[in-house]
Amino acid sequence: MKDDRVMSWPLFALAIAAFAIGTAEFIIMGLLPQVSADLGVSIPSAGYLVSGYALGVVVGGPLLAMLVGKMEEKRALLILMAIFTVGNIACMIAPGFNSLIVARVFTAFSHASFIGMAAVLASRIAPPGKEGRAMTLMFTGMTLANVLGVPVGSLVGQVYGWRTTFLGVVALGIISLLMVWYLVPAKASASKKNTQTNLQGMKRPIIWLGLMTSVMASASMFAFFTYIVPILQDVTHVEPKFASVALLVCGLGITVGGLLGGRLADWSLTRSLVLTLMALIAALVSFYWTSHFVYPAVINMAVWGCLSFCVGMLLQALIIRVAGESANYASTLNVGAFNLGNAIGAWVGGRVIDAGMPLNSITLVAATISLVTLVMVLGMFLSRDRSLLSYPSATA
């Protein structure tokens, strides 16, 4: 009897690895006050740890994709996870702020290639007709990083110091390395086309418009998310330990959004993106007022997290759907696009703070960026290439 279950041991291993990578990426948002105080830099300057990681993803993704692209996928994933683990060891022992930034950038080099390759691999090892749900389950590891990894890591950093948090991330990297080694089959994917054939599909304008849209969506998210703890402490006036609870609630919303995004993509990609972006803009604008009240602010954060990650999943599904045989490359570039937006958003948020504006005004800036994202999405759906959006999920 044929096994039609979406979850499998190889997919579970990929999800755990995604959890480790997501924790490493997002954990710094909950540690900015501790890192700032320990290394003697301002919070806006500490925000460069977010930007530096994101730029490392943008630069390292294409470079490592070329280096490991011809390898058997399991071997490539193991090499990428080893780079990730070594980088987090360097973060843990970094003697100063500059060396910590360098270590974060090095760690980030493996991020885009691993997640991009894992997203496509997840769809390939899934039963026919369930590729989209398999990809969503793999990305659930990233979203769970916000539910468990970021709040727990933030709390550990407050109690035992931020270096102890990075020790935990190193342990996650080692566990992920072992799980990929033992659980992912050596030949889990279909035979690859040659590089030239794969890159031919990247010439379609709709793919690049989709990548630019991912940049803007991510910039909106991280303009707010990077400084969410300082906002909670200085505007909402919560205790530092309660900030971890607020991050946990926000993480639950993010997890729901990640799962919801996969379902909505199967329902109607076009309608879902437009409606979700409209709701996201409303959530960001409302936070400008709810940020002054603890419980409304936390609820608003959870709604925002749900909508933000829902948009991210819809855009990832869009890129894989339209890329066809170029799915590996396009998926890797989309992870890079997301992190380029991460860097831009963190920088924009920092400039808002440096300009002396109220911290919660960052949400209005993020809402404006989301509005631009919505316009770009509408432009994509009106393009001559829009017929590609009706294709089923790729199993390239």
Placement of each model-derived feature along the sequence:
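Helix-to-loop junctions at the C-terminal end of transmembrane segments
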Residues: 61-73, 257-269, 353-354
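Cytoplasmic helix-loop-helix junction between adjacent transmembrane helices
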Residues: 103-141
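C-terminal transmembrane helical hairpin of 12-TM major facilitator-type secondary transporters
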Residues: 271-315
